[in-house]
Amino acid sequence: MSRRCQSRRCRPMMEAMTARLLVFCSCWCLAAAGLFADSAAAETVRLAVQKTGTLAWELDVVRAHGLDRQANLQIAVTELASPEAGKIALRGGSADIIVSDWLWVSRERSLGAKLVFSPYSSALGAVMAPATSALETLADLRGKKLAVAGGAIDKSWLILQGAMQQDGIDLKRQANVVYGAPMLLAEKTLQGEMDATLNYWNICAWLEAKGFRRVLGIEDVLPKLGATGRAAMLGYVFDESWAAKHAGVVSRFLDVTRKAKEILATSDAEWLRIARLVTADASALAIYRDRYREGIPRRPIDAEEADARTLFRVLATQGGASLVGNATALEPGTFFRPRSGS
């Protein structure tokens, strides 16, 4: 057979292969174009958070499940050493969202800063004592060494004082109170240097895993102060003018974090996956999981705001101007309410 004949016979095969290649390349280009378009369209939200905070757990869930990509969001995280650093970042414009409390938001609003608060967690601290301790009630703390995390104007401490004063007990005067860093005080209590500690919920979970018991959870005294439920003290905080300009971003971000919370609320396997972040063994991890789940806010904003107004009065009475400034009530507009349709 001549070379010319062979060439004629091969030409259709070559043309078919070329056509297939062109189709493949076209499909690849279209897919890549769509991918790049999605990436280009993704909007960025800047978070400033504590490296060891529980928000880090949720953000890991967001990334692992692609919740940010599904919402067309790019969440840029700056890790900070303290809550105060987050406040500076927000006020300085280097962060869009931080985690703080409505008390601070209300104070900032009274000073002219238009910040808003969206509930993030209702996990509260507790008074913890060794399993062998004779302490049964807070009245038993009179004359005892009580380690209080966070300082003299810590919210849990002020709430506890307000509740106990209704029973004629002044823990600030009747107990030997020591203030300090949460983990340091937990260690001292563990070593027997303190009789009990009022500490943050995650530190309490750590102590619970060490065999300590809860004498009283702060959520247990809220009804005595007029609250109707477990109030969310911590929330996402951002500028309301920024939120108005980026309503879609805010809505999608809050939706993404709600989905992450639901995964952590329903999946024990997810807790095993993030155990490296919690830095807890299996028994301790279960305690962290259960306490975290108890603190997921599920109440309407109206209920949260009403309880915040009630608790503000207690905190203002106990903490004074150093805590709330010259404000006498929760500032209007403190709680974020999305615009309809956003």
Identify the meaning behind each predicted range.
Residues 43-172, 176-179, 188-191, 195-201, ...:
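Short, glycine-/small- and polar/acidic-enriched structural segments
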Residues 309-342:
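Conserved C-terminal helix/tail region of periplasmic/extracytoplasmic solute-binding proteins
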